[in-house]
Amino acid sequence: MFVELNNLLNTTPDRAEQGKLTLLCDAKTDGSFLVHHFLSFYLKANCKVCFVALIQSFSHYSIVGQKLGVSLTMARERGQLVFLEGLKSAVDVVFQAQKEPHPLQFLREANAGNLKPLFEFVREALKPVDSGEARWTYPVLLVDDLSVLLSLGMGAVAVLDFIHYCRATVCWELKGNMVVLVHDSGDAEDEENDILLNGLSHQSHLILRAEGLATGFCRDVHGQLRILWRRPSQPAVHRDQSFTYQYKIQDKSVSFFAKGMSPAVL
């Protein structure tokens, strides 16, 4: 995890809020560093994590996790991490006969209109364990990234339904957290992606939006991060708070600074 990002969010693994949905969004840049942050954050918080990885392999996340001080292999072996490798699973679903229901069952069903098998996978992965097994602080669902489901033929409404049922189970029933990534293509004609992004934005308690620089590439500033806290239960004056920082990604950390305050500029 990135300590500077924790400081900006005013949180640590031992005092994170529960029952929250965090939306990660990237536009004209790669926001995967946010996924790696939250994955390592919740593993260090001793949470039970269900990771639906639709865009990269387990080895990719494992290599980055080692740099951030967590072992995904050990976490999976001890039952703390349940990992659905979408790339590999998609091949199995399409080219191999499956007797048992598969989380990505919709890939081989032309008229599949829902993600119920994927939800059942998440619910089974995060259900409370018996008292004799390892006890985790609370469950966490992490998805990277939901936009892939649209590319695979699912509609935005079906994906939002999936998120609704996951929230009901993970956030409300089990008092856990959810973190999902959605890519913002910036294409005005991509109505499905806009519906998904807007729907999730209204449901989220925290939105982290990574954006590329309007001026283009810079060696010392890789992008900017917009942080939006949404607190519906608070008075109007304190309901939504937004801050913007620029950042530079390094090998094992990310540095954040106010706009125009890069050490290279000063």
UniProtKB/Swiss-Prot annotation:
Localization, per the record, is:
Cytoplasm; Nucleus
Question: Quick one: where is this thing mainly located?
Answer: cytoplasm
Record flagged with keyword Nucleus: yes
Q: Which organism is it from?
A: Homo sapiens (Human)
Biological processes annotated in GO: autophagosome maturation; cellular response to stress; homeostasis of number of retina cells; inflammasome-mediated signaling pathway; locomotory behavior; motor behavior; neuromuscular process controlling balance; neuron apoptotic process
| Name this protein carries in UniProt | Elongator complex protein 6
Pfam families the UniProt entry points to? ELP6
Q: In which pathway does it act?
A: tRNA modification; 5-methoxycarbonylmethyl-2-thiouridine-tRNA biosynthesis
Q: Which InterPro entries match?
A: ELP6 (IPR018627), P-loop_NTPase (IPR027417)
Q: What is the lineage of its organism?
A: Eukaryota, Metazoa, Chordata, Craniata, Vertebrata
Sorted keywords for this record are:
Cytoplasm, Nucleus, tRNA processing
Could you name the Gene Ontology cellular component terms for this entry? cytosol; elongator holoenzyme complex; nucleus
Q: What does the subunit section of this Swiss-Prot or TrEMBL entry state?
A: Component of the elongator complex which consists of ELP1, ELP2, ELP3, ELP4, ELP5 and ELP6.
Free-text function comment from the UniProt entry:
Component of the elongator complex which is required for multiple tRNA modifications, including mcm5U (5-methoxycarbonylmethyl uridine), mcm5s2U (5-methoxycarbonylmethyl-2-thiouridine), and ncm5U (5-carbamoylmethyl uridine). The elongator complex catalyzes formation of carboxymethyluridine in the wobble base at position 34 in tRNAs. Involved in cell migration.
Q: Which gene encodes it?
A: ELP6
Which family does the UniProt entry place this protein in?
A: Belongs to the ELP6 family.
